A protein has these predicted regions:
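Formylglycine-dependent sulfatase
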Residues: 1-347, 352, 361-380
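Residues forming the ATP-binding cleft of Hanks-type serine/threonine protein kinase domains
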Residues: 358
Length: 385
């Protein structure tokens, strides 16, 4: 996907309100080609509103370098340049490893990284994030930094020390791949992704996924330590979230790009200065709500009428009033609607699904033909943006 250049962003609003706006890591805002330049796609980053971007490649693009006519190689992104400055053989080793992953049938990858921890991609992102904070700490301007780790996206290849630290933990069995009531495209994808995989294979996937999370957890700890030692713990808002989950074998699926809970139900944690008590909320939030939330908390100028999102500030202040009647998500040719109990997955060229998450949290029983009143109530929200 490409964020249209004419689309206003909340990063621009923060910039125009006097903030230094940074990002370190994978942006995923533009995918025109695999070559973003050894400093990242700076024109696009500036246009989107970042004043001080440190863009990196994602997991797979980090391995595809360029080759000169004489056979020598050159970097196509910032992380590749970092590896090649260290040792060109690091780049060749990573590329060879990932190409073997692409040839696997079924195509899944779960083993420790061939790179040492000190040059692992998420280690690079963590180190660059600390550099960014130290560089902008004394500028006199407020700052907003997005740290976008590449993991735990597949390939699941944590540093060996994190893989070993996870150990032979016995992970819960995946949700059964009972395909009754599931659309044909889900059945096809399940056969492609996990057909032929054993329970031992799935345990290995989860071990590597957990190791990938462990890397990120370690670096988040270092970033929080920086806030403590720099004296910014009490004047910094911290938000932790993910963009999606992974199925890791649930319903016979491994990755993302579906509307089941393993993909959609992601963590969202917010800490405000002065907050001393944990508070949980089951409000129907969406990722886009972080935009008005950040703007309101930052005191930036913004127009509520220009956003479909809603600010989470009332929830953070203890409000229990609903944010919205229905939560909505879209993907390719399907739309998901969720009212806090019922989830309706509208597949426009396939079987619709309705799950009662109160009685069926594993989404095993499609009750699409049993609750016409639920569909009638949610239908108007299908076409709202």
């Amino acid at each position: 996907a490409v964020l249209p250049p004419e689309q206003p962003t909340f990063y621009q609003a923060l910039r125009d309100s006097g903030y230094r706006v940074g990002i370190v890591g994978k942006t995923d805002l533009h995918k025109r080609d695999t070559y973003c330049g050894v400093k990242g796609d700076m024109p696009s980053m500036y246009h989107y509103g970042f004043t001080d971007p440190v863009e990196t490649e994602g997991k797979m693009n980090s391995a595809w370098y360029g080759t000169n006519p004489d056979g020598s190689i050159y970097p196509m992104g910032p992380y590749q340049k970092y590896l090649m400055d260290k040792d060109p053989e690091l780049m060749r080793t990573l590329e060879k490893d990932y190409r073997s992953y692409m040839r696997q049938k079924p195509r899944y990858y779960a083993q420790p990284s061939v790179l040492p921890d000190e040059v692992f991609l998420d280690t690079f992102i963590g180190e660059k994030s600390l550099e960014w904070l130290n560089e902008h700490d004394n500028t006199g301007a407020p700052w907003h930094l997005t740290v976008s780790f590449a993991g735990p996206h597949n390939p699941w290849d944590p540093p060996k020390e994190d893989y070993d630290a996870v150990g032979d933990t016995l992970w819960p069995d995946p949700i059964p791949n009972d395909m009754e009531g599931k659309p044909a495209w889900i059945r096809r994808r399940a056969a492609q992704q996990t057909g032929g995989m054993t329970q031992a294979d799935l345990q290995q996937v989860k071990r590597c996924y957990a190791g990938s999370v462990r890397v990120i957890d370690r670096w988040i700890g270092k970033l929080l330590d920086w806030l403590e030692t720099s004296g910014h713990k009490d004047d910094t808002i911290v938000i932790f979230c993910a963009d999606h989950g992974e199925l890791l074998g649930d319903h016979g699926l491994l990755e993302k790009s579906c509307m089941y809970e393993g993909c959609l139900r992601i963590p969202l944690l917010v800490h405000l200065p002065g907050m001393t008590q944990r508070r949980d909320s089951d409000a129907l939030a969406e990722l886009m709500d972080l935009a008005p939330t950040c703007l309101e908390l930052a005191g930036a100028d913004w127009n509520r009428r220009e956003m479909d999102a809603v600010s989470l500030v009332p929830v953070l202040n203890g409000s229990t009033e609903p944010l919205r009647p229905v939560q909505r998500s879209e993907l390719h040719n399907c739309t998901m609607l969720f009212d806090g109990r019922y989830k309706w997955i509208r597949s426009y060229n396939d079987t619709d699904e309705l799950y009662d998450l109160e009685t069926d949290p594993q989404e095993l029983h499609n009750v699409i033909n049993e609750h016409p009143e639920v569909l009638n109530r949610m239908r108007p929200y299908s076409f709202r943006h």
